[in-house]
Amino acid sequence: MADTNRAVEKLQGKFEASILEVKQDRGDWIVTVKKEDIVAVLAFLKQECKFDMLTDVTAVDYLGKAADRFMMVYQLTSVPFKDRLRIKAPVAEADCVIGSATQVYGSANWLEREVFDLFGIRFDKHPDLRRILMTPDWEGHPLRKDYPLQGPGREPYKGRLS
């Protein structure tokens, strides 16, 4: 599959009920899907559409701006066809769990651990979901928009910075 347009069309045909939005931004296709289908969508794109590389996994916190607080973002690349595709999935704060992409892309392992560590989003069936950047005893998730700027229970630094 050499053309992202055709990959998006195939995705729409196979996962019509799962797709929430399809749009283009600055030449890149962005497809938003229900979080319940993220693993199946990623597997389909890898196997059927040759998006063989997961370039990045991250999250966005839309505190107070969207019905679902978080948006998971997966950046895929087709190396043979030099194509990119972004897949997004909304995640509610009340049910802050999504399927793990490690079942499809092994490279998702540390990327998902980073999202868990910094945003608190859990990944179902992740092989080793634990903190990767913050210490194990760290309280909270520092990239959440409601996280205290000075950190939990920490005094502002009063020394010299230079």
Swiss-Prot record:
Keywords: Cell inner membrane, Cell membrane, Membrane, NAD, Quinone, Translocase, Transport, Ubiquinone. GO terms for cellular component: plasma membrane. Gene3D superfamilies: NADH:ubiquinone oxidoreductase, 30kDa subunit. It catalyses: a quinone + NADH + 5 H(+)(in) = a quinol + NAD(+) + 4 H(+)(out). One of its GO terms (molecular function) is quinone binding. It is a peripheral membrane protein. NDH-1 shuttles electrons from NADH, via FMN and iron-sulfur (Fe-S) centers, to quinones in the respiratory chain. The immediate electron acceptor for the enzyme in this species is believed to be ubiquinone. Couples the redox reaction to proton translocation (for every two electrons transferred, four hydrogen ions are translocated across the cytoplasmic membrane), and thus conserves the redox energy in a proton gradient. NDH-1 is composed of 14 different subunits. Subunits NuoB, C, D, E, F, and G constitute the peripheral sector of the complex. Belongs to the complex I 30 kDa subunit family. This is NADH-quinone oxidoreductase subunit C. It comes from Trichlorobacter lovleyi (strain ATCC BAA-1151 / DSM 17278 / SZ).
